Amino acid sequence: MRITQGERESSGEFLMSREFYGVLIGVTTLLVIFLPKSLFLLVILFLCFAISREVSVALGENEVFYFSPLVLLTYYFADPLVFPLIGLLSLYFAYKRWELNSFFKSTFLLFYPALFLVYLIKIKEISTYYLLIFIFGIWINDVFAYYIGKNFGKTPLFPKISPKKTVEGFLGGVLFGSLFFALTLPYGILNSFLLGTFVLTVGVAGDYFKSFIKRQVGIKDFSNVFGEHGGFTDRFDALVFSAPVFYLIMCAGELNCKL
């Protein structure tokens, strides 16, 4: 069976499309969720390094990102040590440039994303099922927000930060994501729906925070490693911001978790 030129072009377009990268990210993430704890930790450390590197390059602090995985490990294994460590590292990088602005950037980069991503590990320690539910809920919100906003969106939510995101997309994403949480979390339908709404709203805030940084530094995406999805920071922003909130909710019903 011969493949026509048109079929080749169509196949090539799909491989570069948003849908292809979405499926690729989704399948890879599902495989990662079920990894043993030690391998899962390595993946989170890589994600921490990748996100920190993208944001560091965008902010012009190219040396700081090496230390972000170290901060994550320090907080995870010996949390009282993390804050003095962050302070010392921030002062070191500020001293090299002798700029207060550099101190604030360095401190931010050492906190972000390390002290957020560590909660993905903590969620998995409570239950792989909860981690699966959390990530699926974020995905459902993202997918419905994108397609509802694209097809029905008329009202910009925060046009100065992200003019393409709409009120309709936001409400649609949060509605369907919260319905998923309502059907899967063990807190009753109404409570689970409301908890899901709160978690997803925090995730949307993370998305806007990322957009704010991009607008400040004048870039469209933090990288193009995932094609139209952008970079690691663009793809996992909502997940990063909402992980601590979801973990705290899970802790409310568990006795074997710690902050």
From Swiss-Prot:
Q: Which UniProt keywords apply?
A: Cell membrane, Lipid biosynthesis, Lipid metabolism, Membrane, Nucleotidyltransferase, Phospholipid biosynthesis, Phospholipid metabolism, Transferase, Transmembrane, Transmembrane helix
- Keyword check for Phosphoprotein: no
Q: State which residue ranges cross the membrane.
A: 31-51, 69-89, 103-123, 129-149, 170-190, 193-213, 236-256
Query: Cellular location of this protein?
Result: Cell membrane
- From the Swiss-Prot or TrEMBL record, give the protein name: Phosphatidate cytidylyltransferase
MF-aspect GO terms: phosphatidate cytidylyltransferase activity
Known catalytic reactions: a 1,2-diacyl-sn-glycero-3-phosphate + CTP + H(+) = a CDP-1,2-diacyl-sn-glycerol + diphosphate
Pfam families (alphabetical):
CTP_transf_1
The record's similarity note reads: Belongs to the CDS family.
Q: In Gene Ontology terms, what is a biological process of this protein?
A: CDP-diacylglycerol biosynthetic process
Q: Which InterPro entries match?
A: PC_trans
